Amino acid sequence: MSAIQRLTGKTAVITGGATGIGFAAAKRFIEEGAFVFIFGRRQEKLDAATAALGPNSRAVQGSVTELADLDRLYEAVKAERGSLDIVMANAGAGMATPLGKITGEQCDIVFGTNLKGTIFTIQGALPLMAQAGGGSIILTGSSSGTTGAPPLSVYGASKAAIRNLARSWAGTLRDEGIRINVLSPASIATEIAKEALGEQGMKMFAQQNPLKRMGQPEEVGAVAAFLASSDSSFMTASEVSVDGGLAQI
């Protein structure tokens, strides 16, 4: 349990919130006093997450690529809480494919989830954030959006676009009392990363950053809580990297 209670009374939505970084952020937000709605595609993962998160969590099943699902999410938030203070647009998709083998379907999936999904996640949240008098938006980026990675070019391009969304929207959202920032992780030991890389792959991947280790989802969740809170009140349109220094070398 966090001793800091920076989010008491706040309501948050986290897409991709049932596992990995999203779940770690949800756990930290609740520890700091927030009520959290997690949103994701797999009902069994959502059920397990809410069982672990406790009574200050709710789950809504759906995909950020389906506008009707996002409508249901925000209807649930409105019905139970009335307004919304924090949105973490964390749902994402990525595929490792070298140039020359990229398909249209892969582009549609990655950009549909990472870019279109983020746009409509935020757009749908704005009326409820206006009811709260403003708040904080966190977009999950990636260090690959800055550094580039040959097998992840489509994914990296989609995350570079996320950074541009924050910069493009910051002035407009200021007038609504809303701050927007990008949280860009890399080298994080999520379950998906462990399954994809294996134990040996994780060890090799860890050596690519200056700290020579993999980060933990909880370390990203702690930074998300900072960005969600008033401690980051003079930050907007910023990108914060939680990647062991990977994007800086």
UniProtKB/Swiss-Prot annotation:
This protein's record includes keyword Glycoprotein: no
Pfam families: adh_short_C2
Listed name of the protein: Oxidoreductase asL5
Chain positions recorded as NADP(+) binding sites: I21, K45, N90, Y155, K159, I188, T190
Record has Oxidoreductase as a keyword: yes
Gene ablation phenotype (knockout): Does not affect the production of xenovulene A.
Family to which the UniProt record says this protein belongs: Belongs to the short-chain dehydrogenases/reductases (SDR) family.
Residue numbers annotated as active site: Y155 (proton acceptor), K159 (lowers pka of active site tyr)
Entries under Gene3D superfamilies matching the protein: NAD(P)-binding Rossmann-like Domain
Induction: Expression is significantly up-regulated under xenovulene A producing condition.
GO molecular function: oxidoreductase activity
Phylogenetic lineage: Eukaryota, Fungi, Dikarya, Ascomycota, Pezizomycotina
Class of the enzyme per the UniProt entry, highest EC level: oxidoreductase
Record's keyword terms, sorted: NADP, Oxidoreductase
